Amino acid sequence: MSNRFAVILAAGQGTRMKSKLYKVLHSVCGKPMVQHVVDQVSALGFDEIVTIIGHGADAVKSQLGERVSYALQEEQLGTGHAVLQAESALGGRRGVTIVLCGDTPLLTAETIDHVMSYHEEEQAKATVLTAELADPTGYGRIVRNDKGLVERIVEHKDATSEEKQITEVNTGTYCFDNEALFQALKEVGNNNAQGEYYLPDVIQILQTKGEKVAAYKTAHVEETLGVNDRVALAQAEQVMKRRINEAWMRKGVTFIDPEQTYVSPDATIGQDTVIYPGTMVLGQTTIGEGCVLGPHTELKDSKIGNKTAVKQSVVHNSEVGERVSIGPFSHIRPASMIHDDVRIGNFVEVKKSTIGKESKASHLSYIGDAEVGERVNFSCGSITVNYDGKNKFLTKIEDDAFIGCNSNLIAPVTIGKGALIAAGSTITEDVPSDALSIARARQTNKEHYVTKKNN
C-alpha cells in the first residue's frame, strides 16, 4: 500500500452560517465538524494529515492541537490555492492524497478507505468521490466516457440540458497521486468570474495530459453532505444522531424515543441500559450495563456504574458507582465521586465531594467540598457550609454518622464515626465519634401567651 496523506480544507469563512463562530467549529452531536473529519482520517493511520487554515486559524489549532500539521492560506483564493499551501509539507513525496472538506462531518473512515483503495486499484492519477442524487440541481455533474472513467466535471450553470439529466454528482472529495496533484496545481489558472484557483480544474489538467481519472460512487449519499448553513447543520445533526443511536441499539441498548435522545460519538453505553427521551449523553461519558437514564437527564464526561439509575438530573465530570440512584432533580457537579449503593434524591446538589457506599441524601441537601464515609444519612435540609465568601473549606463526615434535618455543618469541620447531629443544629466544632451534638436554641413555651396578648 502506498503512503497515504490527507489535506483537510478548513480555511473558508463560511458567511452563509451567519455566525461569529468559525464555520468548521460549529458542532454536530457535541463535536466541531472539523474534529469529526480529523477523527475519521486519524482512524486510518495516515502518514500525515495537513489542515488548511485561514479564518479563525488560532481557534482551529486550539481545537485540533498537535494531531495534525497546519498550512496557512492567508488569502482565500479558491480550493486549488488552498491545497497548494500543503506543498511545503507534502510536495515531492510519493503516495496518495485525499482532499476533504472540513464541513463534511458525516463522512466515515470506511468510505474514505474505500475511495483510496479504489484509486490505488485503478492506478488512477485522480479519483472523484461521487454520489447519485434524485435532485442534482446545483451540483457539478460527472460525465463519464465509454470506459466508465471521468471525462469531465460540468458545473450546473455550464451544463447542457442533456447533461443536466445526469444524476451522478461531484461531492467535493478527491483522491490524487500526490506528485501529480502538486504538479497540476501549479498549472491551475484563475481566469474565471471570481478570480480564484479551483481544485476541480486539476481534473481537467490531468485529462488533457492523458492521465486516468476514475470515479468512486458511494451508496451512502448522506455522508457527502456539506454544511454551509444552519439548515444543513441541523440535517447533519439528525443524520449523525440517528447513526449513533442505531449503532447502540444494535449492541443491546434500548432507546425509548431515539429521535429525542442525544449521544456523543465518544460515549460508551453498556448492554441492557434503557434511555428515556430528553436524555443527553455528552463528551467521553461511559455508561455501564443495565442502567436507567432519564427522562430529561444530562450526563457529560462522566462514568456511570452498572445498574445505576439517573432520572431527570445532571451529572458532569464525575464518577458514579454501581446500583446508585440519582434524582429526580439532582445535580452532581464536577470532581465528585459517588460510590456504590448510594442514594442521591430530589433537589440534592453534590459538588467536588466523595460519598461512601450506602450513604443517603434523599432530599433538599447541599454537599460541597466534603468527604463522606459509608452509610451516612443526610436528612432533609442538610447543608455543608463550605464557603466563607473567599475560601472553600472541607467537611469530613465519617462512617455511620446521621445528620438531622435542617442542619448546617460549618466547614472546616469533622463529624466523627457514628455521631448524631440533632435536627436544626448549626455545627461549628468537630463532633466526636458516637456523640450526640445539639447546637440550637432551647425551646421555650409560654402558656396562654396568645390569649393574654389579645385581651
Curated annotation (Swiss-Prot):
Q: Which cysteines are joined by disulfide bonds?
A: none
**Catalysed reaction, written as an equation:** alpha-D-glucosamine 1-phosphate + acetyl-CoA = N-acetyl-alpha-D-glucosamine 1-phosphate + CoA + H(+); N-acetyl-alpha-D-glucosamine 1-phosphate + UTP + H(+) = UDP-N-acetyl-alpha-D-glucosamine + diphosphate
Q: Where is this region: Linker?
A: 231-251
Q: Where does UDP-N-acetyl-alpha-D-glucosamine bind?
A: 9-12, 23, 73, 78-79, 140, 155, 170, 228, 333, 351, 366, 377
PROSITE patterns tied to this protein: HEXAPEP_TRANSFERASES
Name the UniProt key words of this record, in alphabetical order.
Answer: Acyltransferase, Cell shape, Cell wall biogenesis/degradation, Cytoplasm, Magnesium, Metal-binding, Multifunctional enzyme, Nucleotidyltransferase, Peptidoglycan synthesis, Repeat, Transferase
Query: What pathway is it annotated to?
Result: Nucleotide-sugar biosynthesis; UDP-N-acetyl-alpha-D-glucosamine biosynthesis; N-acetyl-alpha-D-glucosamine 1-phosphate from alpha-D-glucosamine 6-phosphate (route II): step 2/2; Nucleotide-sugar biosynthesis; UDP-N-acetyl-alpha-D-glucosamine biosynthesis; UDP-N-acetyl-alpha-D-glucosamine from N-acetyl-alpha-D-glucosamine 1-phosphate: step 1/1; Bacterial outer membrane biogenesis; LPS lipid A biosynthesis
Q: Which residues bind acetyl-CoA?
A: 386-387, 423, 440
Q: Where in or outside the cell?
A: Cytoplasm
Q: Which domain of life is it from?
A: Bacteria
Note how many cofactor molecules are bound and how: Binds 1 Mg(2+) ion per subunit.
Q: Which SUPFAM superfamilies match?
A: Nucleotide-diphospho-sugar transferases (SSF53448), Trimeric LpxA-like enzymes (SSF51161)
> What protein family is recorded?
In the N-terminal section; belongs to the N-acetylglucosamine-1-phosphate uridyltransferase family.
Q: What does this protein do?
A: Catalyzes the last two sequential reactions in the de novo biosynthetic pathway for UDP-N-acetylglucosamine (UDP-GlcNAc). The C-terminal domain catalyzes the transfer of acetyl group from acetyl coenzyme A to glucosamine-1-phosphate (GlcN-1-P) to produce N-acetylglucosamine-1-phosphate (GlcNAc-1-P), which is converted into UDP-GlcNAc by the transfer of uridine 5-monophosphate (from uridine 5-triphosphate), a reaction catalyzed by the N-terminal domain.
On subunit structure and binding partners, the annotation says: Homotrimer.
PANTHER family found in the cross-reference section = BIFUNCTIONAL PROTEIN GLMU, NUCLEOTIDYL TRANSFERASE
Q: State what protein this is by name.
A: Bifunctional protein GlmU
Identify the species of origin: Halalkalibacterium halodurans (strain ATCC BAA-125 / DSM 18197 / FERM 7344 / JCM 9153 / C-125)
Kindly list the organism's lineage: Bacteria, Bacillati, Bacillota, Bacilli, Bacillales
Gene designation per UniProt: glmU
